[in-house]
Amino acid sequence: MAVKVEPGTVLVMNTHYVNASSEPIEADARINLYSLPAEKVKTEAGMLFYYNPFIRVPENGEASARMRCIVQDDISLVRVQSHMHRRGVGFAAFLGDSAGANQQEIYTTTEWERVPAKAFSPMLQIKAGQTLDYRCDYKNPEARTVTQGQSAKDEMCMLIGPYFPRNAALENCANDKGEHTGTWIGSGTATCGETLGCVVGAKSNDVFYGCIVDSCPGSATAVSDVLLCQMSDGHGACQASCPGADCESCVIQACGTQISACQAAKCQ
């Protein structure tokens, strides 16, 4: 079993460091990679790399980020771990049915720095149609709002784990067309209609992220469906118009079903 790396692929080892002392520190990170002939690989493995971009933690406040992904194929999960930055105070991941119900906790931690990886023995068998649902909890001691991003000044919410056999699409919570299929689950009280109005009026990414965080859990499917339709230019129907003057009207028409469902959705 191995992970295949195609010719020309760039491998990036991304590490984060926070120096809380008054003196410089020397950072060091190393990794060992081992290769074997392609003809000896019987099964190709992959890496789940779920990333939830909808994070907004108010100044001196608390917040959560939650996302649910459908696993499209039968897979074996080797191990799993979280990734958050220093405001992360809790993480939990669950395996559930296609509706996200009947959940079984598969991983939990309160660590953001020395993150434990949970190895499954025997490996965790996940059936096609089951879901992985994970949540990151944050506590922000700073006098500024913190949102998602790549630096230590920002936050992240990720579920990571090697698995097999590989399906490149499901690694990023996407379908075979490359479209994200996850469900973003807010922790607020806003209905889908209110959330959509917030998104349309958002003038910055910070506000946009907050719109989703503030949505109610009961509207999660409707919120995610309309967002995914809009962000994919009407699931590709408006590619010829976007970007352009006719993009907005095309997307509104192409996403009419999702918009109507959103306006009708209630918090339950």
Q: Locations of the language-model features?
A:
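Mature extracellular/luminal domains of secreted and GPI-anchored eukaryotic proteins, especially small
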Residues: T183-Q268
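Beta-strand-centric surfaces of beta-sandwich/beta-rich domains
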Residues: M1-S76, Q81-I185
